[in-house]
From Swiss-Prot:
This is Putative ammonium transporter 4 member 1. It holds the Pfam family Ammonium_transp. GO terms for cellular component: membrane. Keywords: Membrane, Transmembrane, Transmembrane helix. Belongs to the ammonia transporter channel (TC 1.A.11.2) family. Coiled coil: none annotated. It is found in: Membrane. It is a multi-pass membrane protein. It comes from the Eukaryota. The keyword Transmembrane helix applies.
Amino acid sequence: MAAEAAPEWVEKGDNAWPLAAATLVGLQSVPRLVILYGDCGAVGPRTEKDREAFPPNNVLLTLAGAGLLLWMGWTGFNGGAPYAANVDASVTVVNTHLCTATSLLVWLLLDSFVFGRLSVISAVQGMITGLVCVTPAARLVLHKRSRLLARVDDTLAVLHTHGVAGSLSGVLTGLLLLAEPRFARLFFGDDPRYVGLAYAVRDGRAGSGLRQVGVQLAGIAFVVALNVAVTSAVCLAVRVAVPQLAGGGDAIHGEDAYAVWGDGETYEQYSVHGGGSNHGGFPMTANPVASKADEMIWI
């Protein structure tokens, strides 16, 4: 059933099950990501120099914004969608926090296996993935219950946090684990059409279950197609050539907006001051001038 937060025309469709217009919110970024950053001919990826290293500017602000604003704010986003303090809202809030916490922990666990360390940025990505994934089905979750991607210049890691999670949750809402018939009747009444596929097969109503899965897929496809068309129309007009991309602050002024280097890295004069690589580099703090000055003093 379309949520009250969705546009009016959504209510007149075949009633896919997103809570809080989650299909629109969660999936709009997918085609925009592909068009803006993907290697698909619209705008193109960033320059190689920009892709070599792009550390976060401020991890503490990222953590504060994600935890205090996004996670806590999502409580109101999902929990407020029913527009009432009722069973819908309470179940939604509980499911939202459970899914988000689980996704964060799983992401950190995988991070430790693959990279051998735990990362704050990875924790934030896992948290956002959980928030996105649970949103379409937040009030329907029963508690007991690539090579292609490597070519996408996903600067903000949107494809897996929004695209995969949003699509997966939208499909699973009508497919396997969600919408147990007795539980779904609390929200949708006794309409026999609204049943998850797994439960429909069990009850001998496979047709109704397949119909609901088809509706979920159609809703996802519509949102993606709409955004690909609209975003392409906007972005094709603003595409620029690689030489123009290089004409930013680094090329014109010989400096970056945020001159922050990590421990143990070196500041290559060639990169911003036009010197050759034979000039070598020197250990950097947040202030390259101060580092060089300290070196000169100790000499």
